[in-house]
Amino acid sequence: MTISDSRRTFLKASAAAATASAAGIPLANGTAAEAQAISTGIRWDKAACRFCGTGCSVLVGTKEGRVVATQGDPDAPVNRGLNCIKGYFLSKIMYGEDRLTMPLLRKTNGVYDKNGTFEPVSWDEAFDVMAQKWKEALAKKGPTSVGMFGSGQWTVWEGYAAAKLMKAGFRSNNIDPNARHCMASAVVGFMRTFGIDEPMGCYDDFEHADTFVLWGSNMAEMHPILWSRLTDTRLTKPGSEVHVLSTYEHRSFELADNGMVFAPQTDLAILNYIANYIISTGRVNEDFMSKHVNITKTATDIGYGLRDEHALQQEAENPNSGKLEPISFDEYAASVAEYTVDKVSELSGVPAAQLEKLAEQYADPNRKVMSLWTMGFNQHTRGSWVNSLMYNVHLLVGKISEPGNSPFSLTGQPSACGTAREVGTFAHRLPADMVVMNDAHRALTEKKWNLPEGTIPAKPGFHAVLQHRKLKDGDLNAYWVQCNNNMQAAPNMNEEGYPGYRNPENFITVSDPYPTVTTMSADLILPTAMWVEKEGAYGNAERRTQFWRQQVKAPGEAKSDLWQLMEFSKRFTIEEVWGEELLAKMPEHRGKTMYDVLFANGKVDKYPLSETAEGFDNDESEHFGYYVQKGLFEEYAGFGRGKAHDLASFETYHQSRGLRWPVVDGQETLYRFREGYDPYVPEGEGVRFYGHSDGKAKIIYAPYEPAPEVPDAEFDLWLCTGRVLEHWHSGSMTRRVPELHRAYPAAVVYMHPEDAKARGLRRGQEINISTRRGDMLSRVETRGRNKVPQGLVFVPWFDEGQLINQLTLDATCPLSKETDFKKCACKVERA
């Protein structure tokens, strides 16, 4: 009797899996998954997690065209088989009952009407109306009248296609990602200090550090997998310590050896105190400083990123200035000398002994320190400053760019690094850290994209907060939102957000898988494929680029953001978007569409369908007739290769669990700027911060300056917003997972028991929380995971039934243009 091939394969794979399991050996070649697939009918394949910037890898199980299970990928170096609670329920995020499956257009009596009701339409009709509105705006006001708001959740090639469409096609820099709300201050900190973006260290530092310091980061809930690695080191490595700083006590404090609750905005003063402590105790690494660091100070009194007519902007001496001035070490030492332990303790509310204990961790030359931060630093009206102040401390002692010594900026979105930052989807950026303001950068980009000289505008476009202001003012008229829920996420929504969306001069398109606050404010809704319904790539917080295959098809007529971008480009001739002056420089483009010039250009369309993976769908490639993702990736990768942003070949990423760039000669880079790790550091130099032409990093002195809005007699509490473990961002995915919704069904206002008592409030009681911009009903919570100090309340923003961003202030860091969601004044009253 002959055993069938499938049966023989099953027996062989099962035996291998059993043997490996008994020995504790993971099977990297997929043999165990093969055995499980044969026995259950489930196919397993890898993908990057859809949620945060940690970049966990998961195994996706599909059966009969549906994702039926996910599990942690045991071969993934990031998460080593673990998931957080959100990751374990990934299989359910695509199957909410209200999934969008057809384009919806506001209509009355069968024609588009801004005040009409949503009706299903075909893709052709949707794009016909949308293209007409964009053409009308371009004809009337030019390229600055059109814009796009994108995402750190776009795949790498979606972000690249969007940036190319806007900057090369429509000649508008009015494209910005929602990463402006979360990572822009980190970017400015990197660029000013090092001349190049993204962390120099990697997750391996969690196993090498002696001390971990969290600044404005609740890793226990927001980066739980990384927290598990940190926790493992703390519990197994003798002498290791955890220090946590925040404006309220959260779950990360449970592991803290030194937990510090400080007054909002005073992190600026604390960091200057640490620098002063290092200098005054004689622990400056003078050799490192003399070889590798220049010292500067920044312009001060720079305003708060508010409208120009706002009183605080009018009063600023140097509004929006990022000017740096060289200073001597003695001048720097004198500047930080005023930040004594007594002064900073009084200002911040942190006991002096705790501040000294913290400062000693950095000063002690025998301790390796990993500093970690995220939104508490970045969503800050001095976010760019506070990022640089963090680097100042590490540079003073030379604790940087080596295992365990790592100032590490954590990211919140799965590809805020890989797409928003590296691709250049910000209003001022181009691929590989280039910027539109630089003539040489624009010229290089135009050459690579085969564009006439002068195609890309030299002036930065409208950033996220400015986009809302320009929509409201009627200067931005045709607007496309993809892969975010900005009407729930953006600040001061009532005054600056919603009016622009409903301005009768404007046409708003929103692409999303689900109905959201943003889609319901739009004129046209486009149904979007999500996660493994398309082939994708993300770049995580440690510079790791990861790919996945399309696993299942999107429901109904839903299409990926990439398909939408490329298909929409076919609706415009080059004559309609460029004009005669540019066309005269490249007459060979006459008569072509934007699609022909940007995508069917001999580069993007050079890889045949035969190169796509056998056994997997690839809907975009099948539609356009070539391997779209590979073409876009290889064209994009050409910007960074040889320029310290090297990416590996396309196929390499499908065969691996990701690589950390720069990838040179097939080798990833764990530590940048350090000889022996980074191929861009010449032999014999030891350390070279090559982002700056002189190879040196910058210490940037900046003082403490207060927040723009502080509690007073009427609005007597600080309002801080943020996230919780169970939900991600606006909850548009996680609230459709029944288990996650039940675990945390509604937002609450976390309040100190004494503050509640003083207002006659009890736990669970309905209250009204208000600011100068609006009010909202909620319920008071005086217990639970978040223990706030007196004078401050914390409110999560995931709940579309409680739009807390009606209340927040649209103040930003004037340099990064990132919103401060952590500090404004509010009051709480009985409802």
Swiss-Prot record:
Localization per record: Periplasm
| Keyword match Nuclease | no
User: Which SMART domains does the annotation name?
Assistant: Molybdop_Fe4S4
Q: Which UniProt key words apply to this protein?
A: 4Fe-4S, Electron transport, Iron, Iron-sulfur, Metal-binding, Molybdenum, Nitrate assimilation, Oxidoreductase, Periplasm, Signal, Transport
Q: How does it assemble?
A: Component of the periplasmic nitrate reductase NapAB complex composed of NapA and NapB.
Catalysed transformations (reactions): 2 Fe(II)-[cytochrome] + nitrate + 2 H(+) = 2 Fe(III)-[cytochrome] + nitrite + H2O
Q: Which organism is it from?
A: Dinoroseobacter shibae (strain DSM 16493 / NCIMB 14021 / DFL 12)
Q: Supply the enzyme class, top level.
A: oxidoreductase
Please give the biological process terms from Gene Ontology that the record holds.
Answer: cellular respiration; Mo-molybdopterin cofactor biosynthetic process; nitrate assimilation
For this protein, what is any one GO molecular function term? Answer: electron transfer activity
Q: Which domain of life is it from?
A: Bacteria
Write out the function statement from the record: Catalytic subunit of the periplasmic nitrate reductase complex NapAB. Receives electrons from NapB and catalyzes the reduction of nitrate to nitrite.
Co-factor binding comment: Binds 1 [4Fe-4S] cluster.
**What PROSITE patterns does the entry give?**
4FE4S_MOW_BIS_MGD, MOLYBDOPTERIN_PROK_1, TAT
Which cofactors is this protein said to need? [4Fe-4S] cluster; Mo-bis(molybdopterin guanine dinucleotide)
Residues annotated to bind [4Fe-4S] cluster:
C49, C52, C56, C84
Principal location:
periplasm
Range of residues in the leader sequence:
1-35
Question: Under the cellular component aspect of Gene Ontology, which terms does the record hold?
Answer: membrane; nitrate reductase complex; periplasmic space
Q: How is it modified after translation?
A: Predicted to be exported by the Tat system. The position of the signal peptide cleavage has not been experimentally proven.
According to its UniProt record, the EC number is 1.9.6.1
Which positions bind substrate?
A: W797
Q: Which residues form the 4Fe-4S Mo/W bis-MGD-type domain?
A: 42-98
Record-listed Mo-bis(molybdopterin guanine dinucleotide) binding positions? 86, 153, 178, 182, 215-222, 246-250, 265-267, 375, 379, 485, 511-512, 534, 561, 721-730, 805, 822
Matching InterPro entries: Asp_de-COase-like_dom_sf (IPR009010), CT_Nitrate-R-NapA-like (IPR041957), MoPterin_dinucl-bd_dom (IPR006657), Mopterin_OxRdtase (IPR006656), Mopterin_OxRdtase_4Fe-4S_dom (IPR006963), MopterinOxRdtase_cofactor_BS (IPR027467), Periplasm_NO3_reductase_lsu (IPR010051), Prok_molybdopt-oxidoreductase (IPR050123)
Q: What is this protein called?
A: Periplasmic nitrate reductase
Q: Which gene encodes it?
A: napA
